[in-house]
Amino acid sequence: MKQNKGDEVNKDFKSKFLSDAEIAKQKLDTVSSSFCLAKWKQLSLHLTTGMNNSCYHPPLHRADADAIKLDPGALHNTEHKKQQRKMMLEGTRPPECSYCWAMEDNGKLSDRHYRSGEPWAMKDFETIKNAPWDQNIVPSYVEVDFNSACNLSCSYCSPQYSSSW
């Protein structure tokens, strides 16, 4: 049977996805126990509402339209995200990331580890960990929602983003 790329299993019978998350946890924790690369490298942009976030779990927030006129990078590098990044670098848990903190407080790996362990995030680990907290970062994982005509019913979604909910 042919395996899909990413489904490889190591000698301990762990998937590559799980192994990458465990490695990510070790690396992230060298910066702080709240550091998450998704806050730097992921952008979920909802054009119908003007809202965005860097993960599926925290609440959406609005980018400053005036800041975007001066610098389109402000669409991702909002003041809100920069403050959350600063907290993470300092070892403070942003309250909006409570989904991950609950998982970790129960001894489990969280999406902080899984998302950060993916190649689109981990490849920039060294650059991000050594950059100033307020530096603008170009996201490598961009998801754009043009309208609510999506016909999927993802568990993390809602009626405002999917016509199937």
Predicted segments, located by residue:
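Iron-sulfur (Fe-S) cluster-binding modules
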Residues: 2-5
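Canonical Radical SAM [4Fe-4S] cluster-binding loop centered on the CxxxCxxC motif
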Residues: 53-62, 99, 104, 136-137, ...
